[in-house]
Amino acid sequence: MSDWDTNTIIGSRARAGGSGPRANVARSQGQINAARRQGLVVSVDKKYGSTNTRGDNEGQRLTKVDRETDIVKPKKLDPNVGRAISRARTDKKMSQKDLATKINEKPTVVNDYEAARAIPNQQVLSKLERALGVKLRGNNIGSPLGAPKKK
């Protein structure tokens, strides 16, 4: 037999005649375990790459803290931010509970942010900014939040 006699089929027709196991995507842990019990080849790969998600850099900071030898204090909220939150909330005649329900957080979270006890979370701060209409990050903390910039 020469090289010209053997057929190499690549692509979707490679399994002609139903020979060999088909590659499946297991959707649950039970399906993976069933395949392992049957002795099939199992490759568990996590799929990455969603379009509009950004990683939280808090994990990087925690890794840095783990590698440090001396004690590192956690980030705390600036007291000016807490005062700005409480001032804007009272100007809008809202209770802490009302503000918490408006931003879908617990009232204790709002209380911690107003008392400047909370570890700053960018998502919660942005929700508070939008609900109160006041800047809470960067320069000019407590100034009115401008309208979105026109493109």
Swiss-Prot record:
Residues 1-29, 78-98 are annotated as: Disordered. It is found in: Cytoplasm; Nucleus. Disulfide bonds: none annotated. Keywords: Cytoplasm, DNA-binding, Nucleus, Phosphoprotein, Transcription, Transcription regulation. One of its GO terms (cellular component) is nucleus. It holds the Pfam family MBF1. The modification Phosphoserine is found at S143. Residues 88-98 have a biased composition (Basic and acidic residues). GO terms for molecular function: DNA binding; ribosome binding. Residues 96-115 bind DNA. SMART domains: HTH_XRE. Changing K64E: Does not affect ability to prevent stalled ribosomes from frameshifting. Its main location: cytoplasm. Residues 85-139 form the HTH cro/C1-type domain. Residues 41-119 are annotated as: Essential for TBP-binding. One of its GO terms (biological process) is rescue of stalled ribosome. Transcriptional coactivator that stimulates GCN4-dependent transcriptional activity by bridging the DNA-binding region of GCN4 and TBP (SPT15), thereby recruiting TBP to GCN4-bound promoters. Involved in induction of the ribosome quality control (RQC) pathway; a pathway that degrades nascent peptide chains during problematic translation. Required to prevent stalled ribosomes from frameshifting. Present with 47277 molecules/cell in log phase SD medium. Belongs to the MBF1 family. Interacts with TBP and the transcription factor GCN4. Interacts with RPS3/us3. PANTHER family: ENDOTHELIAL DIFFERENTIATION-RELATED FACTOR 1, ENDOTHELIAL DIFFERENTIATION-RELATED FACTOR 1 MULTIPROTEIN BRIDGING FACTOR 1. This is Multiprotein-bridging factor 1. It comes from Saccharomyces cerevisiae (strain ATCC 204508 / S288c) (Baker's yeast). The lineage of its organism: Eukaryota, Fungi, Dikarya, Ascomycota, Saccharomycotina.
